[in-house]
């Protein structure tokens, strides 16, 4: 059964472990007094360590705004975002880049690989910037590549890879620093069904084997069915969530479809 949030917030009691992410009554407004847009309207949610969570909602529901606030790219108008025990609003501007690199991993719809670097060098980039010793970089890069099944492309350049391989290289780059939280923004949006399946199976496997915590924005019900929990947002707040529990992926997909039908559809425009 879907749980409808009586205050527009997801349940804060997820597990006994310390939450990786806590979003508390966050608002985000744009414009002036005469034309104010409320992108986030009392948004609250909690993600525990090791969760694989999908965020779904129609165009204009606040998905991208929320992700930008969590990523410290944008700042909320009010409310609190706690990431790995740190209030992100209190991080100095000079520390933000280091905080993102150390605590967060990013997977975008487009892989955003550097064309002049091999897959190995692209994956290693956040470690190189962080001045990790070369021997450790090689060990970590090989391990990340192995977890995503892309060892054979490590010495290839992006133009020599398929779209699916490029996206898995991007995922390896996001995971190589062992971040507290991976933010995946429509990671399968540019992939065909075969490559989307390979990426989602890899993320699911990494979540289960390495305990990686992943928050994925998606409009795709199939992609969401790989997650353990789905949060549906509307008008800038969570209004329903589904927990997979013991369901098979197919059964969970059917439950997701039921909620989407009631909600009136989830489109790919954000």
Residue ranges of predicted features:
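Pre-NBD coupling/linker segments of ABC/ABC-like ATPases
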Residues: 2-16
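Conserved beta-strand-loop-alpha-helix hinge in the C-terminal portion
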Residues: 237-261
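ABC family nucleotide-binding domain
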Residues: 19-233, 238
């Amino acid at each position: 059964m879907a749980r409808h949030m009586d205050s527009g917030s997801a349940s804060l009691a997820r597990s006994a472990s310390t939450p990786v992410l806590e979003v508390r009554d966050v608002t985000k407004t744009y414009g002036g007094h005469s034309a104010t847009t409320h992108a986030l309207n009392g948004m609250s949610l909690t993600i525990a360590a090791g969760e694989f969570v999908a965020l779904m909602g129609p165009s204009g529901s606040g998905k991208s705004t929320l992700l930008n606030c969590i990523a410290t790219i944008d700042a909320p108008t009010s409310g609190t975002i706690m990431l790995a025990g740190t209030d992100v609003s209190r991080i100095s501007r000079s520390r933000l880049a280091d905080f993102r690199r150390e605590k967060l991993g990013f997977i975008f719809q487009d892989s955003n690989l550097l064309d002049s670097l091999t897959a190995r060098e692209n994956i290693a980039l956040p470690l190189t910037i962080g001045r990790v010793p070369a021997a450790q970089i090689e060990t970590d890069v090989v391990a990340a590549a192995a977890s995503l099944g892309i060892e054979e492309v490590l010495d290839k350049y992006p133009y020599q890879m398929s779209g699916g391989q490029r996206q898995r290289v991007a995922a390896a780059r996001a995971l190589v620093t062992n971040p507290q939280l991976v933010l995946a923004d429509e990671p399968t949006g540019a992939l065909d069904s075969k490559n989307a399946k390979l990426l989602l199976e890899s993320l699911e496997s990494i979540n289960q084997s390495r305990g990686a915590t992943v928050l994925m924005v998606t409009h795709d019900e199939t992609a969401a069915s790989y997650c353990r929990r789905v949060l549906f947002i509307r008008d800038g707040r969570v209004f329903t969530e589904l927990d997979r529990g013991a369901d098979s992926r197919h059964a969970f997909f059917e439950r997701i479809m039921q909620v989407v039908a009631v909600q009136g559809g989830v489109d790919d425009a954000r």
